[in-house]
């Protein structure tokens, strides 16, 4: 059986449908990206454009992103976990959605981080500090250790996605299904996420580079801290969001959504023995590209043609934070109160109120600002197909037509 056939069979094994649109204790805006493009063009927003950008990038690095962490995901240990995950089919536990994303999810592109690490590794090329004898290890312009780093980056990201799918049992409703299903799903989420993190740590040790280990360890610490802050700011059960400025939002977003990619890009340069200046430019690209990617995700509920695709949205997302900043705290709380109907928040009404303000357009400008900063960082790399692919990724997450 071919690898592609195996993936398709596993996809059917996990089922085709996802759980209903529902708010758990964690944020549902997990770096999703769809219907995006470049502000420099006038094409309509379409997932096909993003898929084309990713497909062309994969050809350049010679490594399909969808297979990035497949060796780990198809291991004997995780195969046993997959057998247990099958028992969740038919329930509403969010772990199922994440599991299906491992197999095929062109809309969310869970493997974006690893692909970017490979692209920036190829764009930078070998360092002059590397001896010619070390270059034999390169395939398609990328060292094997850099490919391993890309897989490790994906394992860490995937593990955090799995852990973020843990359901807060104290907030369950009768419509969520049996309590025993949610308890069982939580156990599997904890175990499988820990397994992926353990494999990532093992892979880091095998790289035998203490600076890289330190970078990725600090990225993991940032992720945990950022997710904790997000959960603390969650508006579940409380319609009044935190009073935060966009500067605070950016600090929190860097921790939870940007640090892993930024530090992985820097680590890839360290593995190739590039100097500090090149490492910093790689870090800046990863940081600003990830930031624009997150802002694009936050904007989707406000720019999608079909409002039914996003009935709810995060009240601590970039457009909402900017809307509150322009409006003032008191008027914002008043608008939330006016959108209340029978004790529940009418998101459709609140969305239209936010769209009428300056928050959405300001968020688009902020997304483009970080996109431009990412492009500026790329100017330090020599022109190449890999650099062009990195530029196209930025164009794709900053198009709003």
UniProtKB/Swiss-Prot annotation:
Functional pathway: Cofactor biosynthesis; ubiquinone biosynthesis
Q: Name one GO biological process term.
A: isoprenoid biosynthetic process
| Gene3D superfamilies documented for this protein | Farnesyl Diphosphate Synthase
User: What domain of life does the native source organism fall in?
Assistant: Eukaryota
* Main localisation: mitochondrion
Q: Which Pfam families match?
A: polyprenyl_synt
Enzyme Commission no: 2.5.1.91
Location(s), subcellular: Mitochondrion
Keywords carried by this UniProt record? Isoprene biosynthesis, Lipid metabolism, Mitochondrion, Transferase, Ubiquinone biosynthesis
Q: State whether keyword Mitochondrion applies.
A: yes
GO terms assigned for molecular function: all-trans-decaprenyl-diphosphate synthase activity; prenyltransferase activity; protein heterodimerization activity
Q: Show the InterPro entries listed in the entry.
A: Isoprenoid_synthase_dom_sf, Polyprenyl_synt
> GO cellular-component terms in the record?
heterotetrameric polyprenyl diphosphate synthase complex; mitochondrion; polyprenyl diphosphate synthase complex
Q: Tell me, in a sentence or two, what this protein's role is.
A: Heterotetrameric enzyme that catalyzes the condensation of farnesyl diphosphate (FPP), which acts as a primer, and isopentenyl diphosphate (IPP) to produce prenyl diphosphates of varying chain lengths and participates in the determination of the side chain of ubiquinone. Supplies nona and decaprenyl diphosphate, the precursors for the side chain of the isoprenoid quinones ubiquinone-9 (Q9) and ubiquinone-10 (Q10) respectively. The enzyme adds isopentenyl diphosphate molecules sequentially to farnesyl diphosphate with trans stereochemistry. May play a role during cerebellar development.
The Swiss-Prot or TrEMBL record describes its family as follows:
Belongs to the FPP/GGPP synthase family.
Subunit-structure text: Heterotetramer composed of 2 PDSS1/DPS1 and 2 PDSS2/DLP1 subunits.
Mind telling me what this protein is named?
Answer: All trans-polyprenyl-diphosphate synthase PDSS2
Q: Which organism is it from?
A: Rattus norvegicus
């Amino acid at each position: 059986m071919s690898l592609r056939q195996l993936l398709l069979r596993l996809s059917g094994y996990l089922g085709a449908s996802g759980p209903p649109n529902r708010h758990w204790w964690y944020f549902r805006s997990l770096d999703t990206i769809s219907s995006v493009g470049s502000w420099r063009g006038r094409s309509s927003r379409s997932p096909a454009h993003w898929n084309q950008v990713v497909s062309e990038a994969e050809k350049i690095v010679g490594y399909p992103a969808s297979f990035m962490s497949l060796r780990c995901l198809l291991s004997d240990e995780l195969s046993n976990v997959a057998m247990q995950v099958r028992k969740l089919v038919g329930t509403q536990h969010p772990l199922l959605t994440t599991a299906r994303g491992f197999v095929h999810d062109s809309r969310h592109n869970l493997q974006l981080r690893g692909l970017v690490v490979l692209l920036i590794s190829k764009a930078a090329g070998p360092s002059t500090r590397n001896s010619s004898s070390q270059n034999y290890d390169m395939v398609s312009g990328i060292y094997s250790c850099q490919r391993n780093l890309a897989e490790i980056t994906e394992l860490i990201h995937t593990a955090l996605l799995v852990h973020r799918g843990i359901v807060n049992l104290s907030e369950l409703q009768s419509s969520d299904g049996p309590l025993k299903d949610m308890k069982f799903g939580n156990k599997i989420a904890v175990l499988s996420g820990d397994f992926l993190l353990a494999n990532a740590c093992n892979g880091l040790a095998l790289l035998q580079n203490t600076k890289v280990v330190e970078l990725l360890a600090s990225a993991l610490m940032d992720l945990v801290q950022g997710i904790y802050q997000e959960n603390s700011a969650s508006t579940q059960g409380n319609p009044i969001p935190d009073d935060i400025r966009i500067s605070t939002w950016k600090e929190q977003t860097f921790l939870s959504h940007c640090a892993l990619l930024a530090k992985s890009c820097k680590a890839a340069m360290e593995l190739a023995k590039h100097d500090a200046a090149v490492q910093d430019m790689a870090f800046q690209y990863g940081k600003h590209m990830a930031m624009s990617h997150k802002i694009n995700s936050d904007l989707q509920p406000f720019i999608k043609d079909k409002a039914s695709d996003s009935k709810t949205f995060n009240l601590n997302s970039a457009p909402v934070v900017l809307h509150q900043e322009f409006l003032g705290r008191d008027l914002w709380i008043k608008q939330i109160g006016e959108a209340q109907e029978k004790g529940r928040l009418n998101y459709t009404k609140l969305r239209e109120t936010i769209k009428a303000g300056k928050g959405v357009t300001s968020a688009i400008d902020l997304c483009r600002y970080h996109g431009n900063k990412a492009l500026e960082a790329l100017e330090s790399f020599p022109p190449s197909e890999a650099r062009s692919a990195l530029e196209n990724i930025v164009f794709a997450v900053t198009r709003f037509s």
